[in-house]
Amino acid sequence: LADTHPAASWLPVDPSARAQAIRGLVFIAANCYPMITIIDYPERFVSDLGDDEALQKRVRAGTRKTLHRHWEMFADLFPARPFLNGEHIGALDLYAAVVSKWSGTRAHVAAARPAFDAVLQRIEADPRVAAIFAQHWPPK
């Protein structure tokens, strides 16, 4: 998508910054998104889970803890400049902003990595992003 529509600036032009953004996209896809799937569907990953509510709760809690640890690592590895993509919002910013909305991540990073939480809030505050997010996550 970034190569087909370079004017959209989905990824940075600088090769080093571009590689870092791609690394960030892969990090979220490989480390965060799978944890959300386990939290949402633990029965797909634990064969004996059945209707055992206590076990389901433990699987979800342990997986959520791992997910939040992964977001802490992400925050430490991918600093904003002022956005994750660099000077303007790009693919990594949007992906991080969306995936971090699930499984209690925002509350966790607000406490554990407030600077990263501020980046996510900056991304969400962009009028283009805010309009889309309002459709999927209406203000409370």
Segments (PLM) and residue ranges:
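Amphipathic alpha-helical packing segments from all-alpha helical-bundle domains
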Residues: 59-78
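Extended, well-ordered alpha-helical scaffold segments
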Residues: 62-66, 112-125, 129
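GST superfamily/GST-like fold recognition
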Residues: 31, 36-40, 84-109, 122-123
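All-alpha amphipathic helical-bundle segments outside canonical DNA-binding/catalytic cores
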Residues: 10-20, 62, 80-92
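Active-site rim elements
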Residues: 57-64, 83, 106-109
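Surface-exposed helix-capping loop/turn segments at secondary-structure junctions
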Residues: 7, 76-87, 128-133
